[in-house]
């Protein structure tokens, strides 16, 4: 076991605070509409430019082990806030730094760290309750766009695009962000359920120009096994021919005689038909077939359920308004499934999302949920260079998370104003003793930190701005750093999601409380470099002893 180095009390806290300051100072320059960028060197490829707090925090690793521990604890604040709310990472870092700084001073002055932490926790609970009570639901599409715009660093185009995407696919729908090939940022919306399997044979194509299969009002046969023999298929094919409607077969695989017969019938014009492989693999395939069955009002033909293909009638088949099949994917638009059954299925998938511990499974379940609930939107982010595209993609991701958070828990005035005005909730807050009272005061001061930092990044005096906002009785009154004027934040469209503000404060206080109560730190002792080795130490290398001190 390697030797360890141990630091105690003031020495430990001072080193730790230095690490906190280095990380927080690098992150906080990005806060607000006039926040600056940070350039990060990459071991390969071009440097990365970002204005995203958590991206900066994740890149910082300090040489001093004790300083690094402090920095890593605050990095944890940014990561946790990013995971829970998707935005507000810089605010969380600024709050954590403010609480730790004041807390370390108080401990150095001889106050009890545990009581300080209890005071901090009391104050945070009161502030969170106050912020929640002032939160209001997002009512209009314009407000969704405003949240997106603020989070995307004032880029209105991004805010509008996210609002449009959410309007199209609903709040449950999946919105993904990709890098575009060109200069422009575009929005692609796929309405209905789409899965990544195309036609099994190009002979099924109905639109030769686009090489797609387009079928209106088709029957949909869902089969979980392979189809290779013709005999079991004949009864259902005859019924479909008599109905005069098209047929789409979705099965594990369609091959041999079955596929040949379908192709011949299609070419002779006796039957409009197309065959597609079922999406997914293993248990996920079964679940997705079940989803399609519920969406289209059909049944999965499965021998586990005792249903044989020979005994299938038209009532067991699903239907939809339209199906479009390309070489790569299939889109089912407007399935005729029962709305109650679809809602119940969505509820079931949501419960699985809550329970699962695997990120991969969660992502797949959310995709299934979106396909059932509304559709998929893809925002393709363009730019003049690869570096610019990556930087914009970071901002679009942030904006998307912030917008989802706003829809979930509502909005409060932005620009750090909600936290600054929440100071009033701490007046008359009962504490157990004088040390806890100091803990409450620490939070009272820390709540000003985001407003001060936003103002300072815009070239104004943070203390003056915070003082002026604090004097106002109007809880929406704040400072628009973009224009440099005091205004009603809600009317100016400067709004933050309640969830982001709440999560930032809770995560910051949680980690800061642990840092304040630290009394000893243990780190591995750095290994001493064995400089240029003298000749004598190279025993066993015969006559090469004299080469020990050479630089190669």
From Swiss-Prot:
PANTHER family: 60 KDA HEAT SHOCK PROTEIN, MITOCHONDRIAL. Keywords: ATP-binding, Chaperone, Cytoplasm, Isomerase, Nucleotide-binding. This is Chaperonin GroEL. It comes from Paramagnetospirillum magneticum (strain ATCC 700264 / AMB-1). Pfam families: Cpn60_TCP1. It is found in: Cytoplasm. NCBIfam families: GroEL, PRK00013.1, PRK12849.1, PRK12850.1, PRK12851.1. Its main location: cytoplasm.
